């Protein structure tokens, strides 16, 4: 009998029943909720006279619409305020655990879940948010769902799903200095494209992935969706177990021992078969910078803006031309000659303590360049912010000329007060560089925290490896 992949094991453990058409009813272990995709779901429960099936599995937090400055003054934008107030009212009515805006535990939903130990190995985890794939870093099956599905999970604790195919992305060897998890995942997306993972659950493996901390693995799994896959995951190992141990929602005592024994089985069998295998050489990966309006439009910082004339596919060439026009770039421009206007260090991709430490290491003793209008650091949660302040990282950023903000999704998306103006160019540690993502007419370049910090202090994209040597 052929061995099972990690995805197969997680899927099989949660199937309640399988329909004749192959669709399966999956049991959901953890449901994370935020203010944007939940209002209609709660209203649906209310209209049907239903209660949530298991309130103990649900954790709610406002993150998309919350301000990152002057929280004592409340939320000024009326739409944002209504969404946050509606979540507040709904969780109180239905008895759901909630971290409100001014709670130190508040933060981005994909940061606080793992931080609290609400995300555990072997779980099925859903949220009305496409970057739920983040939680797959724990050897969990995690994926985003729509608002109608949010209501369905609240009401039944189950979800109808079609099984995906299996893909293995193995990053073999070890990365060099200055190359991070963000660079690894951008290189993967550059290799397979934004549709490369469509229809698959991606397992990330290889020595370079095993070498990553849990923060790094979360960064990689976070952007599985940018590769087209609804779910990304990493096998459980000692790194996973050590991260989870002692967290608020983690099991304790005998339950911990039995849980760990089960978690150690959460890896793909040696004879498991994948529908597709992609291999990358970790030693060949350099710090990455996106140049266009799709995460697959990415090159090493040492490279140049690609020329559409060299593309063999006319459709791709047309897309490249449009991207260059929107981004205000010329083909063959060296990446290191591109000047920036703003820097954003944050988002569910790169706002954890490891990310802030990496950025601070570059910033320490330097100043934000004169041409940079705004450089901001937005911790992923109140607890990350608290820890960073205990380590003095806030002072490193403030002394350099950065703004030190309150936790939230912030400038990852133009859904709050933090956004780009038309034509402004931003070095961003977020996950999407679509047209208008950070503000109408805004130009987004995706980079790692260290690369964002390097751009902030030089005023243009800079190979952080060279900066480290100086």
From Swiss-Prot:
Cofactor binding annotation: Binds 1 [4Fe-4S] cluster per subunit.
One BP annotation, GO: L-leucine biosynthetic process
Involved pathway(s): Amino-acid biosynthesis; L-leucine biosynthesis; L-leucine from 3-methyl-2-oxobutanoate: step 2/4
Top-level taxon of the source organism: Bacteria
Residues annotated as binding [4Fe-4S] cluster: 348, 409, 412
GO molecular-function terms, A-Z: 3-isopropylmalate dehydratase activity; 4 iron, 4 sulfur cluster binding; metal ion binding
Cofactor(s) the protein requires to work: [4Fe-4S] cluster
Protein's UniProt keywords contain Ribosomal protein: no
Chain ranges passing through the membrane: none
Keyword annotations from UniProtKB, A to Z: 4Fe-4S, Amino-acid biosynthesis, Branched-chain amino acid biosynthesis, Iron, Iron-sulfur, Leucine biosynthesis, Lyase, Metal-binding
Classification via Pfam families: Aconitase
E.C. code: 4.2.1.33
Catalysis performed (reactions): (2R,3S)-3-isopropylmalate = (2S)-2-isopropylmalate
Subunit field text: Heterodimer of LeuC and LeuD.
PANTHER family in alphabetical order: 3-ISOPROPYLMALATE DEHYDRATASE, HOMOACONITASE, MITOCHONDRIAL-RELATED
Family: Belongs to the aconitase/IPM isomerase family. LeuC type 1 subfamily.
Function, in words: Catalyzes the isomerization between 2-isopropylmalate and 3-isopropylmalate, via the formation of 2-isopropylmaleate.
Name this protein carries in UniProt: 3-isopropylmalate dehydratase large subunit
Taxonomic source organism: Thioalkalivibrio sulfidiphilus (strain HL-EbGR7)
Lineage of producing organism: Bacteria, Pseudomonadati, Pseudomonadota, Gammaproteobacteria, Chromatiales
């Amino acid at each position: 009998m052929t061995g099972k992949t990690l995805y197969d094991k997680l899927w099989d453990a949660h199937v309640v029943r399988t329909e004749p058409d192959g669709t399966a009813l999956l049991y959901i272990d953890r449901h994370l909720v935020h203010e944007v995709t939940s209002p209609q779901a709660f209203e649906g429960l209310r209209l049907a006279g239903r209660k949530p099936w298991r309130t103990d599995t649900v954790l709610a937090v406002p993150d998309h619409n919350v301000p990152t400055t002057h929280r004592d003054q409340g939320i000024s934008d009326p739409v944002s305020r209504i969404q946050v107030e509606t979540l507040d009212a709904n969780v109180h009515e239905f008895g759901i655990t909630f971290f409100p805006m001014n709670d130190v535990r508040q933060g981005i939903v994909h940061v606080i879940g793992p931080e609290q130990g609400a995300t555990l190995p072997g779980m099925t985890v859903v949220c009305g948010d496409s970057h739920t794939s983040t939680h797959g870093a724990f050897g969990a099956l995690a994926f985003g769902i729509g608002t109608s599905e949010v209501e369905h999970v609240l009401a039944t604790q189950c979800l109808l799903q079609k099984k995906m195919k299996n893909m293995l992305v193995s990053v073999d060897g070890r990365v060099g200095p200055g190359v991070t998890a963000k660079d690894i995942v951008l290189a993967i997306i550059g290799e397979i494209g934004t549709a490369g993972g469509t229809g698959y659950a991606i397992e990330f493996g290889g020595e370079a992935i095993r070498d990553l901390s849990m923060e790094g693995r979360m960064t990689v799994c976070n952007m599985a969706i940018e590769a087209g896959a609804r779910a990304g995951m990493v096998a459980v190992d000692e790194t996973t177990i050590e991260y989870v141990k002692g967290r608020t929602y983690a099991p304790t005592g005998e339950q911990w021992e039995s849980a760990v024994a089960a978690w150690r089985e959460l890896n793909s069998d040696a004879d498991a078969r994948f529908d597709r295998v992609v291999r990358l050489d970790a030693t060949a990966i350099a710090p990455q910078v996106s140049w266009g309006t799709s995460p697959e439009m990415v090159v090493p910082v040492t490279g140049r803006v690609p020329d559409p004339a060299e593309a063999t596919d006319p459709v791709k060439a047309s897309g490249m031309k449009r991207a260059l026009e929107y981004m205000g770039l010329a083909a063959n421009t060296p990446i290191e000659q591109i000047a920036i206007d703003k820097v954003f260090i944050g988002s569910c991709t790169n706002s954890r303590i490891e990310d802030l430490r990496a950025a601070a290491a570059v910033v320490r003793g330097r100043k934000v360049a004169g041409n940079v209008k705004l450089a901001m650091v937005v911790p992923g949660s109140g607890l990350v912010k608290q820890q960073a302040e205990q380590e003095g990282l806030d002072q490193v950023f403030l002394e350099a000329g950065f703004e030190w903000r309150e936790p939230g999704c912030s400038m990852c998306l133009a859904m709050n007060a933090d956004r780009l103006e038309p034509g402004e160019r931003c070095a961003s540690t977020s996950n999407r560089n679509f047209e208008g993502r950070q503000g109408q007419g805004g130009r987004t370049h995706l980079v790692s925290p260290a690369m964002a910090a390097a751009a902030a202090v030089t005023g243009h994209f800079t190979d952080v490896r060279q900066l480290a040597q100086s």
